[in-house]
Regions:
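A generic structural signal for short coil/turn motifs at secondary-structure boundaries
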Residues: 33, 93, 144-145, 289, ...
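Generic structural signal for residues in well-ordered beta-strands
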Residues: 46, 53-56, 207, 324, ...
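Substrate-binding groove of N-acetylhexosamine-processing glycoside hydrolases
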Residues: 2-14, 19-21, 34-39, 62-63, ...
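Contiguous, structured surface segment used for ligand recognition
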Residues: 1-133, 396, 419
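A generic structural motif
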Residues: 30-31, 141-143, 353
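Short loop/turn and capping residues at structural boundaries
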Residues: 50, 57-60, 168, 211, ...
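N-terminal small/glycine-rich loop or linker at the start of catalytic domains
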Residues: 122-140, 372-381
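Substrate-binding cleft of carbohydrate-active enzyme catalytic domains
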Residues: 131-328, 338-340, 346-348, 357, ...
Length: 625
């Protein structure tokens, strides 16, 4: 039996209990009103898995055994802890608090998915190792999810005992007075936030407001309304660039209007959330002190400018009655300056390398700082998330979180370069973090992959994720490479010439250029293996395989594109003997299917920008003929 996260203590015992159609789900008298919602979750699971509808009751019956839900404080378990007992007489879940009762129900739902109506007798005691186990989700760099998807995401977070969700905003909220910023988009509305916040509250998920307040304000600072607040001037007529959106576009912190702008955004956004937290972000201010603020930087240094700015924002958050969070990439250059910030501020310590640095966590710990350790699901700039890199990164960051007694583990899902990757391929990385934030005994990769295959995808063989892991590695030319080169060739990016790009980039891909046919053959084999596995999967799992099949088809096309461009710009032989015109048509046909896949989970957002890149590639390929 697979459980994610793995419980702290699990004792399997002799015997079974068979749930009958006359059983009831009984709420103890001490249960809060929220317990009825948890009972409904359980009843829905039983109907889905076994086709039986159990009545929910609040009276104790001797004639109707079944499942009892109780709330009783257990100080040693904390408010999120619970006990689950299955005996020949029935099932009993005791939550130390509301959240604990919910998590006990979620664990029983996982057991039901694997065991059906005949449950093994067991005694399970469980509680989280880390207080905060969260997901940071980018809804600003191209893909804005539908409300249905966001609720499904919250359901999945709760199912795996995550208790915090950040939706990252730069410009994709309907801020008053910002119509020039969001006029061509499909932004989230105040009602969207209120609806999602209430939905998350019922699942014991803290929906945290998260707004860019220093760097990464590309779309805001390219408008006529706010252009003058940019640290470094850029012609407003400059064409859109995925690459440039990741760089530059930092606020001029010496301009009082910049502070007024950020306060307006914060003051509009914060009242929509019930959370006691506010995430001001503040990462990667690449231009700070290099343009309009250079005089101050020469006087006090850019680091002090940063600390002073973050300090102002933190104090404003506290004045609004909330606790601030910010990214730690800049403060780590001088961790002692944490002492200049409010004592309760939380520093989000990110590192997405498969072998992240330990000294950053150690330095913040030495300063007595509250910190979250923040790994990533490794999907940005990819067609399919790199599961091998995600596991390695999450495991190391989780180990540091436990070692340095961090306040939490917050896994990130970023959407660099248009958020091409489908949300489905981020699920394994999210579950890696859920498993490792709850239990400090970090499971081996094969074991965890087998568990996710069984619990999340209903794959009784337990093989699915090992196949997806191999599939995700078959990359010669990724989406990030394609975007960079296309923007250089089209003149949207002038930092490098094509020749300079190839000189920098070729060593990264050259070992695999002669293997494109082999790599694409491995993709074909993985796709075949997924399809052959479907009979071992439940229906819901089968329906979720399309994103992996479609996106890996896209990766095959990008790999073939590498061979043609290498031939064109470096004079190499075309090992695949392919016709550029044929590849152009295949890219366009693939994009037509991709648009349908996008619409399953996302608003229109900036899908058209991905299309523009695909169409430009197709036009270039036709010009080569």
């Amino acid at each position: 039996m697979k459980l994610i996260p793995q419980p702290q203590q699990l004792e399997l015992q002799e015997g079974t209990y068979r749930i009958g159609y006359q059983d009831r789900i009984t709420l103890d008298a001490a249960c809060s009103p929220a317990a009825y919602g948890y009972a409904k979750l359980l009843a829905g699971e039983l109907e889905e898995q076994a086709g039986i509808s159990l009545l929910i009751d609040r009276r104790t019956h001797t004639t109707h055994p079944g499942i009892r839900l109780l709330q009783a404080e257990r100080p040693r378990l904390g408010r999120e802890g619970y006990e689950l007992e299955i005996t020949p007489a029935g099932v009993r879940i005791t939550g130390s608090g509301e959240a604990g009762l919910l998590y006990g129900v979620q664990t029983l739902r996982q057991i039901l998915r694997q065991e059906g109506l005949v449950l093994p007798c067991l005694h399970l005691t469980d509680r989280p190792a880390l207080a905060t186990r969260g997901l940071f989700y980018d809804v600003t760099r191209g893909r804005i999810p539908t409300m249905a998807f966001l609720k499904d995401l919250a359901d999945r977070c709760s199912f795996y005992k995550l208790n915090q969700l950040h939706l990252y905003i730069e410009h994709t909220f309907l801020f008053d007075g910002f119509s020039e910023v969001w006029r061509d988009d499909t932004p989230l509305t105040p009602e969207d936030i209120l609806e999602l916040d209430a939905y998350c509250q019922a699942l014991h998920i803290d929906l945290v407001p998260s707004v860019a307040t220093l760097g990464h304000l590309y779309k805001v600072l390219r408008t006529r309304s706010f252009h003058k607040l940019s640290e470094v001037d850029e012609p407003q007529s400059a064409p859109f660039s995925f690459y440039q959106r990741q760089c530059h576009h930092t606020l001029n912190v010496t301009d009082a209007d910049s502070l007024e702008l950020v306060y307006r955004m914060m003051d509009q956004f914060l009242p929509l959330f019930s959370s006691r937290l506010f995430n001001i972000n503040g990462d990667e201010p690449f231009d700070l002190g290099k343009g309009r603020g250079k005089a101050l930087a020469d006087q006090v240094g850019s680091h002090q400018m940063y600390v002073d700015w973050i300090g102002k924002l933190c104090r404003h958050v506290e004045e609004l009655g909330k606790q601030p969070l910010f990214w730690g990439d800049i403060i780590l250059a001088h961790p002692e300056t944490m002492q200049e910030l409010p004592q309760d501020v939380i520093c989000m310590n990110w590192d997405y390398d498969p072998a992240p640095r330990e000294d950053h966590a150690q330095k913040l710990w030495a300063q007595g700082a509250n910190q979250y350790l923040c790994p990533g699901v490794q999907g940005w700039k990819q067609t399919v998330n790199r599961l091998d890199l995600a596991y390695a990164n999450v495991k190391k960051m989780a180990s540091l979180a436990h070692k340095y007694r961090a306040a939490g583990l917050l896994v990130t899902e970023w959407g660099d370069f248009g958020h091409l990757q489908d949300p489905e391929s981020s699920v394994p990385g999210i579950l890696y973090s859920a498993a490792m934030g709850w239990n400090a005994q970090l499971p081996p990769e094969e074991e965890l992959n087998a568990g996710i295959s069984v619990v999340e995808y209903g794959d009784r063989s337990g093989q699915l994720l090992s196949i997806l892991r191999t599939l995700s590695q078959q990359v010669v030319f990724n989406w990030g490479h394609v975007v960079e080169l296309s923007e250089i060739l089209s003149g949207r990016l002038t930092d490098e010439t094509p020749e300079e790009f190839w000189a920098r980039f070729l060593p990264q891909i050259q070992p695999n250029l002669h293997r494109i046919q082999e790599v694409n053959g491995t993709i074909d084999a993985c796709q075949e293996a997924i399809c052959r596995l479907m009979p071992a999967m439940d229906r819901s799992g089968r329906k979720r395989m399309l994103p992996f099949l479609l996106m890996s088809d896209g990766q095959k096309l990008l790999n073939r594109l590498a061979a043609i461009w290498e031939q064109q710009y470096l004079g190499s032989a075309n090992p695949l003997h392919q016709n550029p015109v044929d590849l152009a048509a295949q890219l366009e046909t693939w994009y037509a299917s991709y648009k349908q896949l996008w619409a399953r989970t996302s608003r229109e957002s900036e899908l058209y920008r991905i299309g523009q890149t695909i169409f430009w590639l197709a036009d270039q390929l036709r010009s080569l003929s």
